[in-house]
A protein has these predicted regions:
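Active-site neighborhood of HAD-like aspartate-dependent phosphohydrolases
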Residues: 2-59
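C-terminal cap/substrate-recognition subdomain and adjoining C-terminal extension
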Residues: 1-7, 64-160
Length: 160
């Protein structure tokens, strides 16, 4: 008996999908405006391909309340329905794990968090590779919102 796509684990992007903003921009605004001496380090890491490093640096310092973020309410209602019927839902984001875990805890329906860390920026093909490694090609659904999600959608059984 074949598995229905709606029964597969659903990986959900955070920035622009679950929330209507981007946590990197929020982190930059909340941290760098208050600590501008960190700007050269962020610029250097960005220019040398170490985006995950500056996300981690800002994630360690960032103080925010996940309840104050603007969530995609219609999508969140749909996710709540999927969760209540037993679907496994994973937060899969390029945001840093420190930040993503706070959002996931606030939302309260994610069974796991896959996120960037100090060394690995979980975006685009890297996110696709991580999801395929965990669930197999075509073994998951994916909800995203940008051109960075195309590589993930290509490997997913369900595209949202």
């Amino acid at each position: 008996m074949a598995t229905e796509v709606s029964d597969l684990p659903l990986a959900v992007d955070m920035d622009g999908t679950l929330i209507l903003s981007d946590m990197s921009r929020i982190s930059i605004r909340k941290v760098l405006f208050r600590k501008p001496w960190l700007i050269p380090s962020v610029i250097f890491k960005e220019m040398t391909g170490k985006r995950a490093g500056w996300k981690r640096d800002l994630g360690r310092i960032l103080v925010f309340n996940p309840s104050e973020l603007e969530y995609h309410e219609g999508f969140l209602e749909w996710l709540t329905g999927e969760h209540s019927r037993g679907r496994v839902i994973i937060l899969a984001t390029a945001s840093d794990r420190i930040v993503a875990e706070q959002v996931a805890a606030h939302v309260g329906m994610f069974s796991d968090v896959m996120a960037s860390d100090n060394d690995y920026n979980l975006r685009d093909r890297k996110k696709a590779e991580a999801l395929v490694a965990r669930y197999g090609e075509g073994g998951f659904g994916y909800a995203g919102n940008s051109h960075h999600d195309v590589a993930v959608w290509e490997k997913a059984a369900q595209v949202i």
